[in-house]
Amino acid sequence: MSHRYIPLTEKDKKEMLDKIGASSINELFGDVPKDILLNRDLNIASGEAETSLLRRLNTVANKNVTKETHASFLGAGVYDHYAPAVVDAMISRSEFYTAYTPYQPEISQGELQAIFEFQTLICELTDMDVANSSMYDGITSFAEACILAFNHTKKNKIVVSKGLHYQALQVLKTYVKVREEFEIVEVDLDGTITDLEKLEQAVDDETAAVAVQYPNFYGSVEDLEKIQSFIEGKKALFIVYANPLALGLLTPPGSFGADIVVGDTQPFGIPTQFGGPHCGYFATTKKLMRKVPGRLVGQTQDDEGNRGFVLTLQAREQHIRRDKATSNICSNQALNALASSIAMSALGKQGIYDIAVQNLEHANYAKNQFKDNGFEVLDGTSFNEFVVKFDQPIKDINKKLAKHGFIGGFDLGEASADFENHMLIAVTELRTKDEIDTFVKKAGELNGSK
């Protein structure tokens, strides 16, 4: 009988070796030099009973600091938001819980409709014409948007604000590293917001696109209308990396003339996780529809006039025209897109607005509390994040905060040397007044101690 966790019996091994004409495992690996072979058992503990193993693993897991054990003020792209209970219940259903790409529409109508609804919701939030079925994460969507701009305009310069997520800039640089002709011009900040004078100077007739974040990485809301005015007449694209929850309250980028709007739907129904997965969205205009990366689901009719859904405009994709594909992205995050769709649908337009308002109010309350307690809070119109200056390294402050039941904000020194000892603090609808008050008080005590 085979081991419970190792299904190969000695008989199985013999049959496999006989099939390939090898007499033993050693003969199978005979080409491997003997001096690099490990001639002993692995130095690991022997097996143990399932009950004791679970007990030991739970003991290890209980050492973790999580949002269930600590109040989280950490954001920087991943936020602790409320997810309606219906989200997990729906995405766990067997008809959705699959990574299969629905190439065969006749057997995939439910999945295709779910993706179509996601695309529709994204278009409504961003005020754009068309959205794809999702991408790996917001930063992937951003990098793909920049590549689209290069290819569409046939220009080689892109102007980006340093207010963009620093990892988005890193990924973009990785994307264009093999294309020496591409130039990335980074525009400095004025405090926590893009220096508009320097941005205007950087944009010229050779610019393929201008890219900003909304709200930006430092929590401040950029002036999209003003930025768009710098682009007019330059034949450059306007790319906006937007927090979709903030769009429940802020004027959507499409209303300011954005050509491409990208972002991450993690705030809607996707929990905070160590390393993901997330769900990027990519929305654009009809003019650029045929250059969109990733999958597109369209609505159609069958021979009998019934409404149906199919993957459409597939000639853009590498499984149809590999050498002329708009992108090498051939997958998506359909399950997470479904989670976000369910969350948005459960909340509704008013619910999204209400939660966005709560984020705004809670963050501004926390900002004022920090000011009242003697902290320097950097100026900027905030949504749910803001920057606070400390007298000590943020890494040390956060270690101490964890001992008092708090997950502190992001150490901005990791993003930029200009923000050493600055903390990016996120305050969502889940943070209570008592948690905020205690967090600010404890931060003040720790900041004053050596």
From Swiss-Prot:
It holds the Pfam family GDC-P. InterPro entries: GcvPA, GDC-P_N, GDC_P, PyrdxlP-dep_Trfase, PyrdxlP-dep_Trfase_major, PyrdxlP-dep_Trfase_small. Its EC number is 1.4.4.2. One of its GO terms (biological process) is nucleoside metabolic process. It catalyses: N(6)-[(R)-lipoyl]-L-lysyl-[glycine-cleavage complex H protein] + glycine + H(+) = N(6)-[(R)-S(8)-aminomethyldihydrolipoyl]-L-lysyl-[glycine-cleavage complex H protein] + CO2. It is an enzyme of class 1 (oxidoreductase). The keyword Thylakoid does not apply. It comes from the Bacteria. Keywords: Oxidoreductase. GO terms for molecular function: glycine dehydrogenase (decarboxylating) activity. The glycine cleavage system catalyzes the degradation of glycine. The P protein binds the alpha-amino group of glycine through its pyridoxal phosphate cofactor; CO(2) is released and the remaining methylamine moiety is then transferred to the lipoamide cofactor of the H protein. The glycine cleavage system is composed of four proteins: P, T, L and H. In this organism, the P 'protein' is a heterodimer of two subunits. Belongs to the GcvP family. N-terminal subunit subfamily. This is Probable glycine dehydrogenase (decarboxylating) subunit 1. It comes from Staphylococcus haemolyticus (strain JCSC1435). The gene is gcvPA.
